Amino acid sequence: MKKPPSSPAACPCGKPRAYPDCCGRWHAGALFLQAPDAESLMRSRYSAFVLDQLDYLLQTWHPDTRPSELEPNAADVKWLGLQIKASQQQDDTHATVEFVARLRQAGRATRLHELSRFVKEEQRWYYVDGDIR
């Protein structure tokens, strides 16, 4: 796992806040796993991917679709940014977030464009799955 950014560092999710005041609060501490909505969870999951916080990713993945394990980022992967294209809550317990995540691997830029589905159970949001665009 990579070390989270120090206090003045911007959050990897792209919000204009320091990591501890943004996604860091969902990754550890009193608000651990308590992202208030699907978009916040999506942003916190992106930050967790950037920081190789695999336990957080697994804990925020719905048990019905969760893989048994995740591999850390390859050494040549550099995450470049997240853009939220759309965020929509269908009802109190279902939401979707469309995003584009940019990364560079082996010197080659690529992007992941996904429409992700989220569900809220027992007061917690979970990533369920997504459709690659």
From Swiss-Prot:
Signal peptide range: none
One Pfam family of this chain: YchJ_M-like
InterPro entries from the UniProt entry: NTF2-like_dom_sf, UPF0225, YchJ-like_M
HAMAP family reported for this sequence: UPF0225 (MF_00612)
Family: Belongs to the UPF0225 family.
Protein name from the UniProt record: UPF0225 protein BPP1723
Organism in which the protein naturally occurs: Bordetella parapertussis (strain 12822 / ATCC BAA-587 / NCTC 13253)
